């Protein structure tokens, strides 16, 4: 938490800390597949990250928004979907990388709770916070976690995963772009005036690679068709239907010359997954311009990470994404 910028407020400090841990765990899991000799060390680090996320200090931001602790109320009906799903996703990666059974009971409880709450909801979706809309990327983390759980537990909860994907394909696609919408009402109805955001769409594509690769490839092609910007600053636009030369979005980051920093970063994941080499290289060139990597003690990292650590964690996860 102390590594997160103070200026974004306690809620977003908590969110960014959660996403930093979650994305770093994803990167370590990916590297365990790419470089099996690193698996033991990676497992230890994923374990440490899970313990960080379990700490009250980190989950406090979610508890304050919901008025109750997310882990002490798993038998209840309030959502907590973002915190719970990221934690469950991290545990699933720990298990899939060969981790022991220390988190088995918690994993069972988290996924059982998510599945029950989803099935009891109005639209198979849950809000991240009270009195707010459904953020589709947050929901997809839950579906990824349940999908991984099903792989580890003889298909348990796979029916919920498949039902959600069917509804996504039939009810939640934007009419103009064909991409998954960014926001839904509690009833599962897309908002007519809400934008389809490049940052959300790129993240949706990334999560879909872990659930339905055919659907993910289709969405990735649509993302490139509607949001890809060529030229010196090659990347994903935050808005496909109008220009934004200078702006700021708490999720996308500073939007400069139309480019979405987080959208471009998340798109690296899909480009890596689908071996879209030319596009991936161009994304990474833009990332280098924006982030400026430096060498220190035989390690390389983005200088921009001194301000936004979450960005470096995201980029490492995206650059190592594997089928």
Question: What residue spans do the PLM features occupy?
Answer:
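A conserved position within tetratricopeptide repeats
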Residues: 1-5, 11, 25, 32, ...
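Extended ligand-binding clefts on enzyme/binding-domain cores
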Residues: 82, 121-124, 132-262
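CBM-like carbohydrate-recognition segments
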Residues: 2-17, 59-64, 75, 216-323
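Alpha-helical junction/boundary sensor with strong preference for TPR arrays
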Residues: 35, 57, 98, 118-121, ...
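Extended ligand-binding groove/face enriched in aromatic
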Residues: 20-22, 27-140, 181, 320
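Well-ordered alpha-helical segments within folded domains of soluble proteins
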Residues: 16-32, 77-95, 134-150, 190-211, ...
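Structural helix-adjacent loops and short alpha-helical linkers that scaffold large soluble proteins
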Residues: 31-47, 94-109, 150-162, 208-225, ...
């Amino acid at each position: 938490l102390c590594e997160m910028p103070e200026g974004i407020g306690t809620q977003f400090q908590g969110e960014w800390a959660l996403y930093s841990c979650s994305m770093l765990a994803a990167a370590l899991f990916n590297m365990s597949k790419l470089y099996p000799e690193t698996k033991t060390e990676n497992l230890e680090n994923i374990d440490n990250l899970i313990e960080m996320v379990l700490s009250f200090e980190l989950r406090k931001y979610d508890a304050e928004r919901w008025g109750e602790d997310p882990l002490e109320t798993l038998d209840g009906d309030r959502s907590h979907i973002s915190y719970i799903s990221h934690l469950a996703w991290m545990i699933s990666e720990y298990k899939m990388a060969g981790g022991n059974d220390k988190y088995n009971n918690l994993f069972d409880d988290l996924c059982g709770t998510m599945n029950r709450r989803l099935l009891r909801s109005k639209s198979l979706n849950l809000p991240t916070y009270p009195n707010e809309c459904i953020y589709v990327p947050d929901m997809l983390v839950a579906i990824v976690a349940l999908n991984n759980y099903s792989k580890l537990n003889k298909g348990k909860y796979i029916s919920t995963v498949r039902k959600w994907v069917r509804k996504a394909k039939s009810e939640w696609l934007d009419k103009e772009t064909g991409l998954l919408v960014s926001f839904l009402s509690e009833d599962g109805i897309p908002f007519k005036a809400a934008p389809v955001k490049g940052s959300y769409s790129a993240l949706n594509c990334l999560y879909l690679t872990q659930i339905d690769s055919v659907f993910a490839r289709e969405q990735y092609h649509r993302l490139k068709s509607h949001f890809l910007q060529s030229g010196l600053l090659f990347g994903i636009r935050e808005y496909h239907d109008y220009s934004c030369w200078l702006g700021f979005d708490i999720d996308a980051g500073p939007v400069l010359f139309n480019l979405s920093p987080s959208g471009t970063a998340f798109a690296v994941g899909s480009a890596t997954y689908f071996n879209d080499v030319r596009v991936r290289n161009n994304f990474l060139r833009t990332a280098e311009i924006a982030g400026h990597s430096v060498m220190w003690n035989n390690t390389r990292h983005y200088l921009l990470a001194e301000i936004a650590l979450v960005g470096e964690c995201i980029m490492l996860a995206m650059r190592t994404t594997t089928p």
